[in-house]
Amino acid sequence: MTVLVRYLSPEWIDAVQAELTATGALVEVAGAHDVGITQVVTDTPHGTIVYHLQVGGGQASFASGPAEPEHVRFSQDWSTATAVATGNLSAQDAFINGRILLVGDQQKLMDSQPVFGALDQVFNSVRARTDYSDDA
């Protein structure tokens, strides 16, 4: 039986970091890219959650709190975050409709697209072990 981790919980953040480490997916692109991305998710069952992805110098990490240094910050509410994470809403549609707000270096974000491709591999693996319910 697979043990589920609640989306955006400390255990989920740890599971993403563990998968990132196990697959090495981001390490391959971390030598060519240097970016700190902070995610802020509001209105979750446990308040506002802040976590980040830090990539650069051949290393990648995923942890609670803001990126240091932070190049890009995404902000969204719980319903948007869960809809995007479960594939019920594309991130592109969420941006276009103003449901995800972006602050920071947009050019660095565009230059870092290979990072997001590698991160998708990590999220796809963790998604199968994630509980997206909003039960507190």
Role assignments for model-derived ranges:
Residues M1-A136:
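Feature captures hydrophobic
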